[in-house]
């Protein structure tokens, strides 16, 4: 056994991986942007609070399946205004939407919409099929060229929090190390 294996044995998981929480973005626009940057399909689970609570439980087993884990991003939304304006396709208010982001993560296309009560096997099959199609039809991005092209086209992404660090403790982001204001 390797040294890493011996160390890992001391830190075994306490619960079942199928019950692990499903990662969720703070808002759909950020999720769509990150999915585009990571070149992944994003799964939008939408509905009212009660529906979302139930969906989190059922989606967990699928999202943590060995064939699925790490291949998708997820977002849970109760307010349809956060996503209806930037998506094309079936915009039913509640359901599981499999979405392909555009090149710059500004918009997305709903490629399949399923009811929230979809059985795990059917959902898993739909996800794997969507991912297979996405991988075959999406050109790999070169980060530097992608950012350059986006800037030329005037596409900008503003994060809710400024980039940088407050090194001098004045409450403002220091733009460049070593430069005085």
Q: Predicted regions span which residues?
A:
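Proteins that catalyze or organize thiol-disulfide redox chemistry
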Residues: 1-181
């Amino acid at each position: 056994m390797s040294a890493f294996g011996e160390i890992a044995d001391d830190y075994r998981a306490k619960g079942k991986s199928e019950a692990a929480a499903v990662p969720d973005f703070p808002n759909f626009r950020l999720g769509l942007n990150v999915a585009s940057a990571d070149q992944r399909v994003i799964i939008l689970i939408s509905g009212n609070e009660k529906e979302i609570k139930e969906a989190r439980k059922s989606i967990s087993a699928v999202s943590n399946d060995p064939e699925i884990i790490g291949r998708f991003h997820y977002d849970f939304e109760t307010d349809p205004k956060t996503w209806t304006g930037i998506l094309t396709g079936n915009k039913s208010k509640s359901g599981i939407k499999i979405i392909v982001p555009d090149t710059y993560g500004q918009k997305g296309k709903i490629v399949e919409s399923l009811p929230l009560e979809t059985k795990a096997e059917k959902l898993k099959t739909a996800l794997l099929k969507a991912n297979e199609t996405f991988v075959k039809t999406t050109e790999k991005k070169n980060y530097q060229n992608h950012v350059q092209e986006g800037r030329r086209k005037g596409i900008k992404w503003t994060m809710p929090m400024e980039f940088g660090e407050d090194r001098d403790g004045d409450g403002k982001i220091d733009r460049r190390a070593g430069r005085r204001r």
